[in-house]
């Protein structure tokens, strides 16, 4: 059930007798945590400690759960571990507000997947034009934020915090001294320095691979499960996580073995890794096969002809998807590509054996490898041997990518493949690099890794996280 302010927990509870009469065994609820004001879907969470007030709050959810259980209906809740909302105004997301206000001194400084290389300010691409043309619309004022009067920077309906100690500066200097940077919305696709859900700037990724962040963001849902109000969880966009396998293991330990399914799009011959501690996927793979029953095989030529005439393209589907991937990576996901290139360049700069790969060569090699992935991602982890099945996915993509590269770019591709697999690179393509434990690597603020092992681990994780959005925004959307 899609829950929101127009269809609350109590509204849903009234339907339980009817659903029971239909033979329904379980109720699947959209995310129930506090979302952005006016949210119609709940995937834009702003507060993990509260149940949606617009849907009625925790007491109303208790009534819904009770009504469902009285009819013998279990309750499954959608969990959004990958991201939080960047709402308008931002103070609705207290964690993000505090990071923008206090920077590295914030208690939430490590929550968000930030690229703080070279001490960049966090980009906030909200301005309608270049900042020089918008200064007259930006003002310093005060506002009551969560019951506390605070100095703020205001821009129309947007409100931003002010770094303590900068309140008395002239506006232009004050803006320069903040932990964030107000910018023209059009530059977000090129310069954004926080990971996000696909290409959506208003959904900022969080780092549930950190045990403390996992606990803080899941505490409320785990409590409701322990109280018997929730019977199972559906995990949204599991491929966005740094370590999906570890996340599922953490959730099982925290809940004592709860029933869990993961939103995972499996390609036709793909199977879920055997060590994923869940009951299976949400069923997209089953739906693919069931939908096939409603298609007459002999009609494929007619449907293909219709598609070609409507699209104006004589290309087959595979070529169309490949072209879509090229567009997506060069445009919508440029900032993600740029981050990978920056990490690869830093690795090369720090290891004399790997130098003399140019930025252009690495850029092209990374792009082509992303284009040729046949699945949403390979499940690789720093410090853990890569299963042969996952290695084959990357090697297969690399084999296809080689057809599009020059000789110099082929050398760069070999390095990129080695990094994606967690190997040492050109100096030793066959052996695995000795990496710190995943908890040590992933508990550091991304972008602040300095030693070679940490940079390699970061590339390994970031590359895997980028593959999914490329597939989703090309093949899935196409």
Pin down the residues of each PLM region.
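Short aromatic/hydrophobic contact patches that present stacked aromatics
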Residues: 2, 205, 232
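A conserved hydrophobic secondary-structure block that centers on an alpha-helix together
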Residues: 223-233
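Acidic/aromatic-lined carbohydrate-recognition and catalytic surfaces
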Residues: 1-191, 195, 227, 237-303
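Flexible, glycine-rich loop/tail regions that form catalytic "lids" or insertion modules at the edges
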Residues: 167-225, 241-249, 258-478
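A generic short-segment signal for beta-strand/edge and adjacent turn/coil regions
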Residues: 44, 201-203, 230-231
């Amino acid at each position: 059930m899609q829950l929101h302010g127009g269809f609350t927990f109590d509204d849903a509870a009234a339907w339980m007798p009817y659903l029971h009469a239909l033979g329904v065994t379980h109720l699947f609820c959209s995310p129930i945590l506090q979302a952005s004001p006016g949210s119609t879907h709940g995937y834009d969470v702003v507060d993990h400690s509260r149940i949606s007030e617009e849907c009625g709050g925790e007491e109303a959810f208790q009534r819904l759960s009770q009504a469902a259980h009285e009819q013998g209906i279990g309750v499954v809740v959608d969990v959004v571990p990958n991201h939080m909302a960047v709402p308008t105004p931002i103070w609705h997301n207290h964690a993000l507000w505090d990071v923008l206000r206090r920077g590295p001194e914030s208690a939430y400084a490590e929550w968000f997947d930030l690229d703080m290389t070279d001490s960049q300010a966090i980009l906030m691409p909200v301005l309608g034009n270049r900042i020089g043309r918008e200064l007259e619309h930006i003002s310093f004022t005060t506002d009551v934020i969560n019951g506390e009067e605070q100095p703020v920077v205001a821009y129309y309906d947007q409100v931003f915090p002010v770094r303590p100690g900068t309140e008395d500066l002239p506006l232009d200097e004050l803006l320069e001294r903040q932990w964030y940077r107000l910018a023209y919305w059009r530059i977000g696709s090129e310069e954004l320095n926080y990971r996000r859900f696909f290409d959506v700037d208003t959904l900022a990724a969080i780092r549930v691979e950190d045990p403390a962040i996992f606990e803080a963001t899941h505490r409320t849902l785990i409590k409701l499960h322990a109280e018997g109000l929730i019977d199972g969880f559906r995990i949204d966009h599991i491929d966005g996580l740094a370590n999906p396998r570890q996340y599922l293991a953490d959730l099982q330990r925290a809940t004592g073995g709860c029933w869990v399914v993961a939103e995972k799009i499996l390609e036709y011959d793909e199977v879920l890794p055997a060590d994923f501690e869940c009951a299976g996927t949400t069923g997209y793979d089953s739906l693919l096969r069931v939908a096939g029953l409603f298609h007459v095989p002999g009609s494929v030529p007619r449907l293909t002809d219709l598609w070609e005439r409507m699209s104006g393209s004589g290309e087959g589907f595979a070529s169309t998807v490949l072209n879509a991937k090229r567009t997506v990576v060069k445009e919508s996901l440029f900032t993600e590509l740029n981050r990978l290139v920056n990490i690869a360049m830093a690795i090369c700069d720090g290891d004399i054996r790997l130098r003399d790969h140019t930025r252009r060569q690495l850029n092209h090699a990374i792009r082509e490898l992303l284009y040729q992935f046949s699945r949403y991602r390979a499940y690789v982890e720093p410090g853990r041997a890569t299963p042969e099945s996952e290695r084959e996915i990357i090697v297969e993509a690399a084999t296809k990518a080689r057809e599009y590269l020059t000789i110099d770019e082929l050398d760069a591709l070999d390095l990129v493949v080695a990094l994606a697999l967690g190997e040492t690179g050109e100096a030793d393509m066959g052996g695995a690099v000795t990496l710190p434990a995943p908890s040590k690597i992933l508990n550091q603020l991304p972008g602040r890794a300095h030693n070679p092992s940490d940079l390699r681990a970061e590339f390994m994780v970031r590359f895997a996280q980028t593959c999914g959005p490329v597939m989703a925004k090309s093949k899935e959307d196409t």
